[in-house]
C-alpha cells in the first residue's frame, strides 16, 4: 500500500507512526506543507500504482482545512475507477497553525472557525455528505475502534471510500507526532508569554537534526 500526506500535523504523524514494508510507498510533502496536495496527489499516485500493483491501496490522510481547499479529485477518482481510501481528520479549522500561534505566546486568531470574529454563526461542514455527493462511499466514525472497522470496510470496497473523524484541535496529537516546529518569535516584546516562548525557541533550535 501507499500513504500520502502533506500539511498540518499529518506529515509528523505519518513519519513517527506509519510502519512501511518497503521503500517508495510513503509520499509525504513535508518541505512546504502544501495544503491541497493530499487528495490530488493520491489520485496521481494511484494512477501510477495501479499499473504495477492494482491490488494495493492508496491511502490519503487529510485535514479538514486542506480538504476544503482541494477535494475535487475525489470525483476524479470515482469517475476513472482509481480507488482511494481517504481519511479526513476534522479539527474545526487550521488547528496546527493555531497551535503554532499559541506556542509562540500569541492568542488564537482566525485559524479555528469558532475563533473568527467576523463569522456571526460558525457551522460545521458535513464532509461525509460532501464526499458522497461526488460518488464516494463515506462514513463518519467517533473513536479509534470505529475507525479500525471503517478502514477494513474501505479496504474491501471496490471504489473510493472517505472516512471522517473529528479530532481535538488542542490535544489531537500522538506523542511521537508532537513535533517541534521552528517558528520565529519577536526578540523584543513586553509580553511575558512571548519572551518565554522565545527562550524555549532558542533552546530548542540546537536540538534539530541537521539535514543531509
Model-identified regions with their sequence ranges:
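Thiamine diphosphate
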Residues: 13-212
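Active-site pocket-lining segments that scaffold enzyme catalytic pockets across diverse folds
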Residues: 1-9
Amino acid at each position: 500500500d501507499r500513504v500520502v500526506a502533506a500539511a498540518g500535523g499529518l506529515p509528523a504523524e505519518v513519519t513517527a507512526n506509519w510502519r512501511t514494508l518497503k521503500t517508495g510507498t510513503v509520499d509525504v510533502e513535508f518541505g512546504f506543507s502544501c495544503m491541497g496536495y493530499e487528495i490530488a496527489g493520491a489520485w496521481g499516485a494511484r494512477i501510477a500504482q495501479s499499473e504495477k500493483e492494482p491490488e494495493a491501496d492508496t491511502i490519503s490522510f487529510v485535514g479538514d482545512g486542506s480538504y476544503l481547499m482541494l477535494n475535487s479529485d475525489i470525483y476524479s477518482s470515482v469517475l476513472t475507477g482509481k480507488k482511494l481510501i481517504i481519511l479526513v481528520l476534522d479539527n474545526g479549522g487550521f488547528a496546527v497553525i493555531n497551535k503554532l500561534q499559541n506556542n509562540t505566546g500569541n492568542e488564537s486568531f482566525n485559524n479555528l472557525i469558532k475563533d473568527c470574529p467576523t463569522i456571526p454563526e460558525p457551522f460545521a461542514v458535513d464532509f461525509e455528505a460532501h464526499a458522497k455527493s461526488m460518488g464516494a462511499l463515506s462514513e463518519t466514525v467517533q473513536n479509534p475502534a470505529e475507525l479500525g472497522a471503517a478502514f477494513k470496510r474501505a479496504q474491501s470496497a471496490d471504489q473510493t471510500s472517505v472516512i471522517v473523524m473529528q479530532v481535538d484541535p488542542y490535544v489531537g496529537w500522538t506523542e511521537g507526532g508532537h513535533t517541534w516546529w521552528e517558528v520565529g518569535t519577536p526578540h523584543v516584546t513586553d509580553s511575558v508569554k512571548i519572551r518565554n516562548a522565545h527562550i524555549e525557541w532558542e533552546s530548542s533550535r540546537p536540538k534539530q537534526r541537521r539535514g543531509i
